[in-house]
Amino acid sequence: QLHEHGLALKNQGDIDRQFLAGAISTGTHGTGINLQNLSASVLGLQLVLASGDHVQCDKANEADLFEAARLGFGSVGLITAIEMELAPAQVLREGGWQANLDELVGQIPALCERHERFEFFWFPQSDLATIKTIEQVEEEPQYPLAAEGQRQAFSFEVLPSHRPNRHTEMEYSVPAELGPECLNSIARLLR
């Protein structure tokens, strides 16, 4: 519905099957070193607390409650309304390719700087990684939509990923400068 009003989320995860309140309160994020998770765009919340009280909160009113609730995994209360900072609707172009993991690891910092959104998926049973980049473009969407990795369309059509394969996904938080060595250590352990 945002698109009908010329608007979009500033960032979103690559899974679009959850409710907005759940995506916000779990820290759902996309990729990009200069993009924040969804909770950073929240300006205000309406909550129903365990006591049954209805509370409206933001940075000026009930600020501590607001900060706890917007990334609180639902522990503070039930989110019943959200006020968010939005972006104008945008066309994104997706690119993708495969590379050898060992070669890719040394390029990660440069790829993060070069691309608005950069991510990769490594398949531990092989030496290959699938790379995905997404850039905002000042061009028209291209329909019908191309295959994933080649789409050029509005953000809500490009950012979600199709996941037909069963998989287990894990996310770790390490300082960015230690990321390549951390990945190399995991790869050595699994090989």
Report the location of each language-model feature.
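Noncatalytic alpha-helical scaffold of FAD-dependent oxidoreductases
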Residues: 1-191
